[in-house]
Swiss-Prot record:
This is Glucose-1-phosphate adenylyltransferase 2. Homotetramer. GO terms for molecular function: ATP binding; glucose-1-phosphate adenylyltransferase activity. It catalyses: alpha-D-glucose 1-phosphate + ATP + H(+) = ADP-alpha-D-glucose + diphosphate. It holds the Pfam family NTP_transferase. It comes from the Bacteria. The gene is glgC2. GO terms for biological process: glycogen biosynthetic process. Keywords: ATP-binding, Carbohydrate metabolism, Glycogen biosynthesis, Glycogen metabolism, Nucleotide-binding, Nucleotidyltransferase, Transferase.
């Protein structure tokens, strides 16, 4: 698809995901034992034929930029293909991006240089699989100014999203960002139609909208709050329903905003379901990433004769379980689990050592942590709260490189 430029917004602070985002951008947070969050959006682009991609970075972007370099330097510039990381250029003044629309406005020169007819705007911090090609086809067929991908959710959940109203032709006639009382679907009072933060603009429409928005001192320079509501009046904004039968990706209807510790934890745990709600195993839709070349995971008997055990868990390469027990957990690469240690309902990031006799329950252990022998985490909320962050649902988070 040579006529479309893809812009991935990857510069948000992700403060609700702290401490996992204390030293990295949210799209660079590890997920599922081997991936980074942004890998899902980039994989969708790859399989959808989108080969001109700008990744707009900002907040603590080193880890993200390194991942893009190591894992995604796969396109051929001689064929006009690229994935380019774009930090703030300060071309329109020495300030950080003030909103999603402002981020693209400050890089309009790159859009103009691309000579594309259409611009796809994506977020780098959602977990889902989607073929974007049919959405572009509908955008062109409708002669739309803007096409917004959408899905229906429970009305209570809709408060966190932009809520849309559409007619029988899927033309959008209303859009309100994060309403306290979300309007429901006409045929279902318990469900609302929400934006997924996936947009296709016709280039000239986007350019004009961003220029006008930049001149509006009252604007928050956000797509959901400012750009989309104004474009609706043109009558050329259409909705594209996610989870249809179009495209090459299997219909699993899974999309998650992993902006909080609890939503991030649950999205990981979803992968451990007997039939996961998101299919990572579709042969022609593999999730690409960068992964160090570690040897295969293994179990080994400990000195006391205990066998290493994995039950209903995802285990990455380089893991050695020497007499420990791992149940319903995700263990990333190069992790060492020692004798009589137990890990239950937990997420372990790379390069962690879990000492003899440790008990870890309902926790997330970030990278480069050495958990001392017989440490308990997730069993005593009062003790855990003195050392670590605990989410609303009781998930204990041990930050990167924490020293016990």
């Amino acid at each position: 698809m040579q006529d479309i430029l893809t812009v991935i917004l990857a510069g948000g602070m992700g403060s609700r995901l702290s401490p996992l985002t204390d030293d990295r951008a949210k799209p660079a947070v590890p997920f599922g034992g081997k991936y980074r969050i942004i890998d899902f959006t980039l994989t969708n682009c790859l399989h959808s034929g989108l080969r001109k991609i700008l990744v707009l970075t900002q907040y603590k972007s080193h880890s993200l930029q390194k991942h893009l370099r190591d894992g995604w330097s796969i396109f051929n510039p001689e064929l006009g293909e690229y994935i380019t990381s774009v930090p703030p250029q300060m071309r329109k003044g020495g300030k950080w991006y003030e909103g999603t629309a402002d981020a693209i406005y400050h890089n309009l020169w790159l859009l103009e240089r691309s000579e594309a007819k259409y611009v796809m705007v994506l977020s780098g911090d959602h977990i889902y699989r989607m073929d974007y090609a049919p959405m572009l086809e509908e955008h062109i067929a409708n002669n739309a100014a803007l096409t917004v991908a959408c899905m229906d959710v429970n009305c209570k959940e809709a408060k966190a999203f932009g809520v849309m109203g559409i007619d029988e032709r899927h033309r959008v006639h209303s859009f309100v960002e994060k309403p306290q009382n979300p309007p429901h679907l006409p045929n279902d009072p318990e469900r609302s139609l929400v934006s997924m933060g996936i947009y296709i603009f016709s280039m000239e429409v986007l350019q004009q909208a961003l220029i006008e928005d930049a001149d509006d001192d009252a604007s928050s320079h956000d797509f959901g709050k400012d750009i989309i509501p104004k474009l609706i009046d043109t009558g050329s904004v259409f909705a594209y329903k996610f989870c249809g039968s179009k495209g090459r990706v299997d219909k699993d209807c899974y999309w998650r905003d992993v902006g909080t510790i609890d939503s991030f934890y649950q999205a990981n745990m979803d992968l451990l379901e007997p039939i996961p709600p998101m299919n990572l195993y579709q042969k022609d839709w593999g999730i690409r990433t960068y992964e160090p070349q570690y040897p295969p995971a293994r179990t080994v008997s400990s000195g006391s004769g205990n066998e290493g055990i994995f039950i209903n868990s995802i285990i990455a390469n380089g893991v050695i379980n020497s007499g420990g027990s791992v149940q319903h957990s995700i263990v990333s690469s190069n992790v060492r689990i020692n004798d009589s240690a137990t890990v239950v309902d937990s997420i372990i990031f790379d390069d962690v050592e879990i000492g003899e006799g440790c008990q870890l329950v309902n926790c997330i252990i970030d990278k480069h942590v050495k958990v001392p022998p017989y440490t308990q985490i997730g069993l005593n909320r009062l003790e855990d709260a003195q050392r670590f962050k605990i989410s609303e649902n009781g998930i204990v988070v041990v930050p990167e490189s924490y020293q016990f």
